[in-house]
């Protein structure tokens, strides 16, 4: 379309040249800055222990406790030995967008993975929460319940499929049709299974 617009005189060639110049100038500036930096980085630093420690620290300091009714948290390891993890994000490698910012890490640790590694002697059950009533049944049998809800790359994207251009908010990866709140099925899961077990906590993933 752009080439056609230039040929038809709708877009001036100078505008194209000016735009290209700005891009190339910026690329060269960063390239020269890297050459003059004096430091070099190779693949050995990718996923090194220092970087893993920093990632762990960032994750820990990025967690915010929004509410702790009846001081349920922290769970007591000697009392809460039978745990239930609810929600489709409980076993997902949910580490960000799948677009240009996607990161391909050597390994990922889901909430379920982390709990199993931290509490090897505890009984930990997972259910995706598809049936809230069954989730409530499982909740009644657990010592504590952890709901893992929130957003993944399909909710945070910017891409809207052309065949859904007339309904942007419903498009996968576009604006969320239900606004900025949790998905209705996750809200229903918490409302139905949550009250069954007083020792329930919700992990909200967003960002």
Model-predicted segments: where are they?
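Conserved beta-strand positions in repeat-built beta-propeller and related beta-rich domains
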Residues: 35-40, 75-76
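Long, well-ordered, tryptophan-enriched scaffold segments
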Residues: 2-35, 43
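C-terminal non-catalytic regions of proteins with extracellular/luminal or membrane-system context
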Residues: 1-13, 45-49, 53-207
């Amino acid at each position: 379309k752009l080439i056609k617009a230039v040929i038809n005189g709708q877009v001036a060639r100078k505008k194209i040249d000016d735009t290209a110049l700005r891009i190339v100038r910026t690329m060269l500036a960063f390239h020269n800055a890297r050459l003059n930096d004096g430091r070099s980085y190779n693949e050995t630093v990718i996923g090194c222990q220092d970087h893993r420690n920093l990632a762990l620290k960032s994750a820990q300091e990025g967690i915010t406790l929004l509410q702790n009714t009846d001081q349920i948290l922290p769970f007591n390891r000697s009392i809460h030995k039978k745990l239930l993890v609810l929600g489709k994000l409980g076993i997902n490698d949910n580490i960000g967008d799948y677009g240009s910012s996607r990161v391909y890490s050597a390994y990922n640790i889901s909430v379920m993975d982390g709990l199993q590694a931290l509490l090897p002697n505890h009984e930990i059950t997972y259910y995706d929460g598809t049936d809230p009533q069954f989730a409530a049944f499982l909740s009644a049998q657990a010592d504590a319940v952890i709901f893992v809800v929130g957003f993944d790359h399909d909710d945070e994207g910017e891409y809207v499929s052309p065949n859904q251009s007339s309904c942007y908010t419903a498009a996968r990866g576009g604006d969320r049709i239900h606004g900025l709140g949790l998905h209705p099925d996750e809200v229903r899961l918490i409302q139905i299974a949550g009250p069954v077990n007083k020792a329930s906590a919700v992990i909200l993933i967003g960002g």
